[in-house]
């Protein structure tokens, strides 16, 4: 997502990083602010948020947003929390890895992993399914409650 701010700054858009000219220069180009967010516009003109550009998983030439995969997995009644990240892969470059916290009383089994993978295959593009599924007790989070993908 890029915001045009020239000739005058747009209300609500920051003017730069405090005492960090290099970081400011990396997001401002010719009066345009590059947010680092990725979205797409449908035929009706609505914008759909995909995620952060630095979170995008690049697998076999495809660009996969973790937010879509997380949202799909969260539809399952036995999933309490989910975080999706990239895992290195020799053939594909990266693959989708899903770290999942199950509701109390549900056990993470190989059969459940396959069920989750098949669910994602049938509710998104088949290449987006998590090739790695890990069950965890909890997910690492920032102080504001956001999942720390780099720790998954």
Task: Show which residues each predicted segment covers.
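General small-molecule cofactor/ligand-binding pocket signal
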Residues: 133-136
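Glycine-rich active-site loop/lid that clamps phosphate-bearing ligands
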Residues: 1
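AMP-binding/adenylate-forming catalytic core of the ANL superfamily
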Residues: 4-10, 15, 23, 38-128, ...
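Adenylate-forming
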Residues: 18
